[in-house]
Amino acid sequence: MKIGVLTGGGDAPGLNIAVYTFVKLAERKHEVYAIYHGWRGLLNKEVKRVSSRDLLDFAFSGGTYIRTSRTNPFKDEERARLLESNVKELGLDVVVAIGGDDTLGAAGEAQRRGILDAVGIPKTIDNDVYGTDYTIGFDSAVNAAIEATESFKTTLISHERIGVVEVMGREAGWIALFTGLSTMADAVLIPERPASWDSVAKRVKEAYNERRWALVVVSEGIKEYGGPKDEYGHSRLGGVGNELAEYIERSTGIEARAVVLGHTIRGVPPTAFDRILAVRYATAAYEAVENGRYGVMVAYSNGDIAYVPIVDVVGKNRLVSGYWMRLYETYWPDLAG
C-alpha cells in the first residue's frame, strides 16, 4: 500500500516522534509518504516518499519536520475535487492524519466520501480533542507553562506585585487548570467556568495582603476578540491577560503585570510522557492500518489505547468537567460570575 502521513493545525511537542514511529513500522511492508504542510500538501502535491532514516535526526525535537498548515481541503467543492484527483494521481491508499478537531474532521470527510481511507491521531496542546484523555503535546506544554510561571512568580515576590499569566486554550481550560493547580495560583480563569472579575480582584487582593504578592492564571479563550479568522472559522485569540491585569490594578490599586506565554510553550522538546504517548499512538495507528480498521482515531482511555470512530469525535470539544471541574471548584469556589 501507499500510505501518506500528515500533521495539521498548530504544532505540538511529540509530532516528530509520532511520524517517525509510524514510518519506522510501516516502511517494513509499505511505501510511506510525507505529506508536507498538512492537507495543503495534498492540494499542492507536496508529497515525498520518506524513510525512518530521513526523520531520525528530528524525532525528538519540538515542532513538525513535515510542516503543517490550517488548510481546509473541503472548504468548497472545487478543493474537494482537486483533493480527490490528486489522491488518485498519487496513488495513495491511506492517510494517517495527526491533528486536532479540524484535521481529524477532514480525515473523516475524506473517508466518508471514499477519497481515501483514514486513521487519526489526536494532537493539540489544548487537550480538547473529544474521545481521548490526552493528546500529543499537552503534557509538554503544561510543563513549559509551569516552569515559566514559577520563574515569573519569583519576580512577583521580589517586586511585591500581582501577576497574570495568560496561557493557550480556546474552548477548554486544561492548560490553565493544570498550570494553576501545579503553581497554587490564587485564581484561575477557564472558558468553562465564567468568573466575575470583581471576585478575582477581591481574591487576589486578599492574597496580596497576606504575603505581598499574588498570582492569576487565565486561559486565552475566556474572551474572544474580533478580527481575522482562519479557514475553519476560528477567531484569533489573545490579549485577555493584559486586560485582566489592568482591571485588577484599577480595582485594587496594586501594581499588576501580565505575561503571555503563547507559542513559546508549544515549541519545547517533548516530555517523557508525550514521547511515550506518541509512540503508543503511532503504533496503534499502524496496527489499525494493518488490520484494515479505518475511519477511526486512536485514543487514550484510563491508561489504555483504544479506537474511536472519527465521526463520533469531530465537532465536539473535551472540556473541563466532572472530576476536574469539582477539583477546580474546590480550590477556587469564590470566583463565580
UniProtKB/Swiss-Prot annotation:
Annotated keywords: Cytoplasm, Glycolysis, Kinase, Magnesium, Metal-binding, Transferase
Native organism: Thermoproteus tenax (strain ATCC 35583 / DSM 2078 / JCM 9277 / NBRC 100435 / Kra 1)
Protein localization: Cytoplasm
A Gene Ontology biological process term: fructose 6-phosphate metabolic process
Pathway(s) of this molecule: Carbohydrate degradation; glycolysis; D-glyceraldehyde 3-phosphate and glycerone phosphate from D-glucose: step 3/4
Gene: pfp
The protein's name: Pyrophosphate--fructose 6-phosphate 1-phosphotransferase
Catalysed reactions, semicolon-separated: beta-D-fructose 6-phosphate + diphosphate = beta-D-fructose 1,6-bisphosphate + phosphate + H(+)
InterPro entries: ATP_PFK, ATP_PFK_prok-type, Phosphofructokinase_dom, Phosphofructokinase_III, PKF_sf
